Amino acid sequence: MDVAQEKPLLSSGQLDVHDLDECRNIRKGSVFIIASGASARDFPLHKYADVPMITMNGAISKFAGTGITPFFYVCTDQGFSQQQPELFTEAMRLCKRVALWERHVWHTTLKPRGELYYLRRAPKLGWRDLLKTDKDLVRCRKLGNGRNRTLGFSRNLKRGFFDARTVAYLALQLAYHVGFTRVFLVGVDLDPLAGRFYEKSGSFVSPCVLDDHFHTRILPSFEILARSVMNEDFRVYNLSNSSRIPVNLVPRVTLEEVDRLI
């Protein structure tokens, strides 16, 4: 795992934006996805410091002061940099790679220390897509309502990603894009009542809409992941005992089991 030493460039100027092809299939093996759920609070980060880690939003706070550099940071909430400016600044300072919306980048004065990649959504499912198989974009094969047309899993982020209304699902697509074959979810509780591990009493709490989308987008997206993406070459495991993701979709493991798998 890399150790953060340099500070970010905080001045304006031309951004060095990298093509997503540059980070496709560049790694293999295990990766941890560190999310913000309360269960991430006790995860022993230093024990697995040599394993690449993808993190998101305020979960970057778990890395502050550790000397551990996240392999990738992703954020799709354009309001996060205004709601939690200190955490967003920390992410831009620490991370080796950052994936953001282009319009998000240009609405902030921060330039990431690491490589910058732009995100974009995968195109909606059309009638012609029903007649062909797309190896990069795994879709819900039902036209139905407009929601079904935007559900899926992207194996190639150059083609766009599918938004499940939880950034952890984007992180899963990123893990596949980069080439990892064993993914361990940390803090993917998806439980608004439990809160985020980094939130403290009396501090500002960013809005949470997980309940609004759990049954309409989040759960159907994980069903696509389990049914059409997970296999011998791409395994996903959940370290959260309080996660709302059903165990029949993503199996749960203990740290002892993780030690045998990585």
Question: Residue locations for each model-derived region?
Answer:
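Metal-ion/cofactor- or nucleotide/acyl-coenzyme-handling active-site neighborhoods
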Residues: M1-I262
